[in-house]
């Protein structure tokens, strides 16, 4: 007869768990967790770039239990931490590098470059929808209890409400999305989030990037545009109806001696008053 016993432990907010290498207290902040895992794995990464973003990444806090012995540390980090931070992670000359996603960081992101379409920076596709479901009503489940196998708390972004409550809020992008597309609901479970502010940040980030639908164009550019990177925001003008339209680079590759860029085109009057 095989017997199986389960044991659970609990501890205070500043007790137990992994501790930080350089500061006192538990390892809970998003940027610190990324640096800790990258360092322990002996991966090549851009230390200065990660440290430079700590003031932003450490606004997101994570806690929880890891009981999956088959998942690798890097896969766990990507799926449970990095995917909820306002960054795009790329491989650069310095190794694994974070690029701040300015669409998450600000409702009205500033452009870094202004470009008018020309023979050296040429749009080669029409505006095409990306395969990304629209969401404007988002329920976030967090505070996962391993002992009870359930989430102990939740928050909701609801575009229909007129008066906000402690755990149910509205959002300008969600409201605009609801007016355009009707109600689009989704539930997101966050097993490593216990902090209320972090839950709200992640909820608004998801609404921000998925509330209005995602469209894209592809650009072919000469080598002189090698300075453009994933995550950069440009003001693009072209004959297809774009006039200083803010776009974000979401893809970059090298093909037949030219750069290929994929630009995210957003129809958001807060950012692009002229529209498409």
Locate each region found by the language model.
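Extended acidic/polar, glycine-enriched regions
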Residues: 1-3
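C-terminal extracytoplasmic interaction modules
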Residues: 7-276
């Amino acid at each position: 007869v095989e017997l199986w016993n389960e044991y659970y432990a609990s501890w205070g907010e500043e007790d137990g768990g992994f501790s930080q290498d350089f500061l006192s207290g538990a390892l809970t902040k998003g940027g610190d967790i990324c640096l800790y895992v990258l360092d322990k794995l002996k991966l090549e990464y851009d230390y200065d770039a990660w440290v430079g973003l700590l003031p932003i990444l450490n606004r997101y806090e994570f806690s929880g239990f890891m009981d999956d012995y088959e998942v690798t540390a890097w896969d766990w980090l990507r799926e449970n931490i990095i995917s909820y931070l306002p960054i795009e992670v790329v491989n650069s000359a310095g190794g694994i590098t974070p690029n701040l996603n300015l669409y998450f960081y600000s409702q009205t992101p500033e452009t870094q470059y202004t470009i008018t379409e020309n023979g050296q920076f040429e749009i080669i596709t029409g505006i095409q929808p990306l395969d990304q479901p629209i969401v404007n009503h988002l329920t976030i489940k967090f505070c996962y209890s391993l002992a009870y196998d359930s989430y102990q708390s939740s928050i909701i972004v609801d575009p229909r409400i007129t008066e906000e409550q402690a755990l149910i809020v509205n959002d300008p992008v969600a409201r605009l999305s609801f007016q355009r597309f009707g109600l689009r609901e989704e539930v997101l479970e966050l097993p490593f989030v216990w902090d209320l502010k972090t839950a709200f940040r992640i909820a608004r980030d998801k609404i921000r990037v998925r509330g209005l639908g995602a469209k894209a164009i592809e650009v072919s550019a000469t080598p002189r545009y090698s300075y453009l990177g994933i995550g950069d925001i440009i003001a693009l003008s072209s004959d297809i109806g774009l006039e200083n339209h803010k776009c974000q680079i979401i893809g970059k590759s090298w093909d037949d001696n030219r750069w290929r860029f994929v630009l995210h085109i957003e129809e958001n009057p807060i950012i692009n008053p002229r529209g498409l």
